[in-house]
Amino acid sequence: MLQTIFTYEWKQLLRSKGLIVALFIFTAIGFFCLKQGAIVYQYQRISVDSAMAKKIRSYDFVKNIFDTIKHSNIRSSIETPYILERRLQDVVAKNISPLSVLSIGQGDIYAPLISGHFNNEIFKNNFSEFKNPEQLLAGNLDASFFIVFLFPLLLLALTYNLQSADKELGIDSLLYTQAASVDVLFRQRLLFRWLIALLPMFFLTFLSFWLLYSLPGFSSLSFLQWWGVAFLYALFWLVVVALVHRLKFNSLVNAISLAGVWVLLLIAIPGLLNTWFNFQNPATNKTEIAEFRDYNAKIWDQSSENKRKHFFANYIQVLKGSANVDSNFIDIFSSALQILDKEKELHNVIANNANAQMKAEEKSFWINPVGGVVRSFAIIGNTGLEQQIQFEKAVMKYREEKLHYFFENILFQTNFTKKDFEKIPTYFEPNMELKFGKYLLPLSLLTLIAIFLSSIKIKNNNQ
């Protein structure tokens, strides 16, 4: 019976030239979205590779200097922290996952490169405050955008009149003469049209695998997880369509109802929630970042007495030998410490605000299940906000370690030797593999509830 229904629907599909054209158009749009993600990835990959190659060349150049340097009682310029850092041209790169091609997420908002110089504040690289993925609403033109926003429209266009059209054309009486019940026939026809709507997604799945599998860092498990989330989302919309059809509306009402559900789930609810969350957790004003830069200048202009007072509060062990320490180094170190502390304070305020908003959004996924899908895509693609926060915190920690290492060497040693150079702290990337299953729980539960409600309705009809 299923084969007969599929054959019938396939013949109907071939007769509908407009539907075939629509499938080709949606497939072309999907290809364009995938290409846009690939362009962003390629641009970032080239930027990172170029910057890291330059960093390696600079490191080798400075290393050669320390291989031949002759030390004396007076430090050479290369042995001073600022000159050494300027020569090293240190930069830290975030891991760019191949799956970011599918879900750009925060990838086009935040640069994947941050200066590793201990005195180059993070706000020089990124002026804007954090933004959450759900706040992007329509999002980026990538595969996740196509799946989240456009796939439902294609499915709704294929199925809105699936049941009502038979009655409107006067052929519904023929369906009652079939061996199978009308509900079974409806489910089989709906399944076929859902599979037709999935054709562009199948195309993107195979094409994306062909594009990504050879890229460095590609993970088959993560790839399957990403597309698993996509097909779970597609299943959710299948159940939504089935549930609306159980109400036995005519084609016009079905179209309006399904379009209303699309607007509600993808535009209205996320938009209202974001407005509320922004009110509850206002983003850090860019004026505060500008004021931090003014603070930077004020610290360098403060008196030497104030600088030394702050320094000795942190390094009391230096008091005994302070007469032997160059006061200029103390002033510079003190200023750098104060600026970094202020930068960490401001960055923590921004990060804590973002974390508070993300937790609030997580609770709202029960009424905004699409938000959970968007966040899952971003996490699997390593482009989520939480991963960006972890990256920037790791860079802050790295810069602080370097600051203390360079200046403590000046305080407690006569020279900065080759051995000291080889022990310069290195950056370690934090573990950014986050669990995303909890974000899909609302969508999964809502899908099961809709299936249950549809089953009850079908059972009552059969009775």
Question: What does each model-found stretch correspond to?
Answer:
Residues 11, 160-164, 208, 212, ...:
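Membrane-water interface at transmembrane helix exits
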Residues 25, 29-38, 134-153, 192-249, ...:
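Secretory targeting signals
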